[in-house]
């Protein structure tokens, strides 16, 4: 296997993807901040809006702790963006729902995101978008396979 140098197309592609990921993260932070929430609170608001929100499952899907999700929920409750009620079927659980204020914030976030999508993405041709999507999917799949293989090898080495 040959070493990858700084001028290599692979290295340049990695730099470009890293820059893209950082830009996406910064944009998400700006959109959230402009709406008065954090990116994490935005994710929870989006999930609550689906009406299938279960805090423990959300924490697991985000590789987060239940305590971290509880903290975000308390912040959203304190900000009057969500309300909580005891579950009908299982009184040990709470049902979370967006308040009118929470819906307004989420609508503003979605509107800002849609405006950004239209301003940035609509200038690309269908072919460019299809090629990018195909490449991104292949790259994601390869990274996932590599990560699973590494985890399996690490687990086997521990046994």
Which residues does each predicted region cover?
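Active-site phosphate/pyrophosphate-handling residues
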Residues: 15, 43, 130
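N-terminal helix-turn-helix DNA-binding core of bacterial DNA-binding proteins
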Residues: 26-68, 79, 151, 157
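C-terminal regulatory/oligomerization modules of transcriptional regulators
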Residues: 1-5, 126-159
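N-terminal leader segment of winged-helix/HTH proteins
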Residues: 1-35, 100
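Anionic, Ser/Thr-rich low-complexity intrinsically disordered regions
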Residues: 7, 13-16, 35, 39, ...
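A structural signal for well-ordered alpha-helices, especially hydrophobic packing surfaces
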Residues: 21, 106, 140-144
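Charged, amphipathic alpha-helical coiled-coil/dimerization segments
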Residues: 25, 75-137
């Amino acid at each position: 296997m040959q070493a990858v140098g700084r001028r290599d197309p692979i290295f340049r592609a990695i730099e470009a993807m890293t820059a893209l990921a950082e830009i996406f993260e910064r944009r998400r932070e700006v959109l959230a901040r402009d709406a008065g929430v954090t990116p994490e609170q935005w994710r929870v608001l989006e999930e609550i809006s689906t009406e299938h929100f279960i805090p423990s499952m959300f924490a697991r899907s985000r590789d987060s702790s239940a305590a971290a999700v509880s903290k975000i929920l308390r912040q959203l409750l304190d900000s009057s963006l969500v309300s909580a009620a005891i579950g009908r079927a299982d009184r040990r659980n709470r049902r979370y729902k967006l308040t009118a204020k929470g819906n307004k914030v989420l609508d503003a976030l979605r509107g800002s995101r849609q405006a950004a999508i239209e301003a940035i993405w609509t200038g690309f041709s269908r072919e460019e978008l299809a090629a990018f999507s195909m490449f991104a999917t292949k790259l994601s799949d390869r990274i996932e396979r590599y990560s699973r293989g590494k985890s399996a090898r690490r687990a086997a080495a521990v046994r």
